[in-house]
Amino acid sequence: MARRPVFQEVTETTPPGTTPSGGMIDAGHKGARGAIRLWLVVLFVMVAAMIALGGATRLTGSGLSITEWKPVTGAIPPMDAATWQAEFDKYRQIPQFELVNSDMDLASFKRIYWWEWSHRLLGRLVGLVWAAGFVFFLATRRIPTGWTPRLLLLGALGGAQGAIGWWMVHSGLSGEMVRVASYRLATHLGLAFAILGLIAWYVLALSRSEAALLRARRAGEAKLFSMTTGLMHLAFVQILLGALVAGIDAGRMYTGWPTMGGEWIPAEIWDATLGWRNFFENPALVQFIHRMTGYLLAVFAVVVFLRARRSPHPVTRGAYVAMLVALAVQVALGIMNVLHASPLPLALAHQIGAVALFTLILRARHHARYPYETSVRGTVR
């Protein structure tokens, strides 16, 4: 039998006009990746809306208006005067009413009730959209190989988020607490951003075939990816610190910038009676740390951006430009919040800005790991 030349074996293994299989991400029914990606985009938008609505609920002082956790029957709001009065009577028994809102009437209670009810309802809808989508894709065998655990993880984290939400609310229903515990608020918000980040990463992973991702990873920029990973973690820490600021209303203690009460380091930064609790309960220290971390985040982001400018991939460079623009807007919003004592519109814009910035950091990080190829003609692949 005649021998085949080595080069002939390599070049003729795959017949002309055919393409290699995409692998596990491309497994399943045709178009499954696109359908799952669309479902995840819907979930991403809903979770982002949850974060914004949660911020509005906190800023309007509405978070303790519903004093019970009823995951199923709680979806039905009060429908008559007697039920409304019963809900109001429950609220009147907690410290927030007794110490802060003792002059509140039923009409005012209804306004804060609707904020909290809407926030919880949206959470239930997120759970339903996840469950319906997961069951559908599982039943029709459209979930690509290896993706079932990832999608299940989203559902598990969503369930945990509901339980943590109640754990947070419960902290403000007894004793002398007139708001939820700040560290529980930070836990609740942190998990929300973790879920949002996971969904965003999955959406990006499903935007190309596995074969394309494998090719792209060979051209990935390890140093830039590592630096952006550090930036992502620092941004997450800053988000948690922002929750601590919000939890004790520390943003309104000092309304000057760049100094705090005319000092670079405020005299009230440490209360010896609080000890380690200064980091959670001392408004001066909490705001100071949030400011300093913000400066560090901004400087590090510029360093990462300058490194990204050396990337040979135009799409990657563009992703880092978008990230830096979002950071500049977020810094400006933070300063404006300080100067104007965090009015609701500005404070809400600052929280939405955090969502945008965190998402764009993740996007830039993904492009550093899986850059898009650009042909000689300038087309992106």
Swiss-Prot record:
GO cellular component: plasma membrane
Cell membrane recorded as keyword: yes
Superkingdom, taxonomy of origin: Bacteria
Region (Disordered) residue spans: 1-23
Alphabetically ordered keywords of this record: Cell membrane, Heme biosynthesis, Iron, Membrane, Metal-binding, Oxidoreductase, Transmembrane, Transmembrane helix
Residues that span the membrane, as ranges: 34-54, 120-140, 151-171, 185-205, 228-248, 285-305, 319-339, 342-362
First-tier enzyme category under EC: oxidoreductase
Subcellular location: Cell membrane
Family label: Belongs to the COX15/CtaA family. Type 2 subfamily.
Known function: Catalyzes the conversion of heme O to heme A by two successive hydroxylations of the methyl group at C8. The first hydroxylation forms heme I, the second hydroxylation results in an unstable dihydroxymethyl group, which spontaneously dehydrates, resulting in the formyl group of heme A.
Name of the protein this chain belongs to: Heme A synthase
Gene this protein is translated from: ctaA
